[in-house]
């Protein structure tokens, strides 16, 4: 039968994951819909400036 491995390497990797998830809690949360909306709004603003001032070749 196969021997059961100890928790040596597994314990180290799980500690790293805990630190990752703890640091993620303090980051800025953005809704993906807001990011796509900001991209579309930026594109519309650039096209409006292009039509108005003709700055884009």
From Swiss-Prot:
Subunit relationships: Component of the protein translocase complex. Heterotrimer consisting of alpha (SecY), beta (SecG) and gamma (SecE) subunits. Can form oligomers of the heterotrimer.
Pfam families reported for this sequence: Sec61_beta (PF03911)
Positions on the Extracellular side per record topology: 54-57
Organism for this UniProt entry: Methanothrix thermoacetophila (strain DSM 6194 / JCM 14653 / NBRC 101360 / PT) (Methanosaeta thermophila)
Main location: membrane
NCBIfam families: PRK01253.1
GO (cellular component) term, any one: plasma membrane
Full protein name: Preprotein translocase subunit SecG
Biological process, per Gene Ontology: protein transport
Residues passing through the membrane, by range: 32-53
Topology of this chain in the membrane: Single-pass membrane protein
Family indicated by similarity: Belongs to the SEC61-beta family.
Role this protein plays: Involved in protein export. The function of the beta subunit is unknown, but it may be involved in stabilization of the trimeric complex.
Cell location: Cell membrane
Keywords: Cell membrane, Membrane, Protein transport, Translocation, Transmembrane, Transmembrane helix, Transport
Gene from which the chain derives: secG
Cytoplasmic face residues: 1-31
């Amino acid at each position: 039968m196969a021997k059961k491995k100890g928790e040596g390497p597994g314990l180290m990797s799980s500690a790293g994951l805990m630190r990752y998830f703890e640091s993620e809690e303090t980051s800025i949360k953005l809704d993906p819909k807001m990011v796509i909306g900001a991209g579309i709004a930026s594109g519309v603003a650039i096209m409006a400036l292009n039509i108005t001032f003709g700055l884009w070749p």
